[in-house]
């Protein structure tokens, strides 16, 4: 449908233009989530994921415009008889599936593992669109144009193959990570200790995360993002997992010796972003894990770090022994905020409903505008904390977060 010489009217031309823009954005969308290291470190996965979402929906809407205009321009023509049209229709169906399951309401109803598997159909859609574009697209006939598009597709495909497949496989084979043992940390929270070879050469820092695939024979291809909950060591790593959903429930039942496939490390909420001076960290639930690793790793002065730890129940507070050690030896101040949620939009528990968000933050750390502020937790909660931090004058360059969820 991208270009029939028999219908060179304005409707057909606009349809072809919409198709070209859609293809451009679709390739950009693929590259944004190809996990190219220098792009990921420059912008962060949370920003790239947001751009990926925007470009994806924009590309899909342009694709729909292309389909509608082509149907109008070529009314009466048997389009299914055109070369590559069956593949194009299959590509459209695959992309519709991806878009529908990416709408927030639908996404909330799906478990991460199932959503991730469905999302992979986007690659099928991109690949199946190729015959349609190059076989009947008149805009693709000039040699220079064909070279550009083949190069763009090759770059996108190569980025995915290198950084999503080859590099993770190479690191997996090189470091040979296996599960050493599993310890409970709190109700519904377990830590997985892993050992491997040459872990001192694994380019990971405290605060980063991997996508983990545990080769236990069940759902092996399903990856889950979990951050390190302790500083990386030359002989061991630790992750801590909240036991919800299929993937994390499997993790809690892993046996020692289970091999692990890793993809990463990802994330830029590390010591590299630390500007120096006092630190205030705010964690909600399992979001404490990367912040605990940073508390061990950052070179803040004695008594210059505060951890605000938000949980629903006292028994959900994890890592008490480590936090007590950090309090005694490095002067870390622990501020537990325990209780059910307050009104929508607040990061405080219901007990503190009389406090405004910004005022509460200032009362915890009066000079917080001069601190590096690290935040990790659910998206809505993190957004509330960021809003309060900006209200009390924390510069954008000192606000750090990593949203590695879906």
Question: Which functions belong to the PLM regions below?
Answer:
Residues 288-299:
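Histidine-anchored nucleotide/phosphate-binding helix
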Residues 124-131, 246-247, 251, 305-406:
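Reductase modules of NAD(P)H-dependent flavoproteins
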Residues 52, 119, 207, 287, ...:
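Short, conserved phosphate/pyrophosphate- and ester-handling motifs at nucleotide-, phospho-/glycolipid
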Residues 279-282, 374:
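Conserved beta-strand elements of the Class I
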Residues 15, 169-263, 270, 304, ...:
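Ferredoxin-reductase
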Residues 273-277, 368-369:
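Short helix-loop-beta connector
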Residues 1-191, 248, 269:
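Membrane-embedded alpha-helical bundles that constitute the cytochrome b-like, heme-associated redox core
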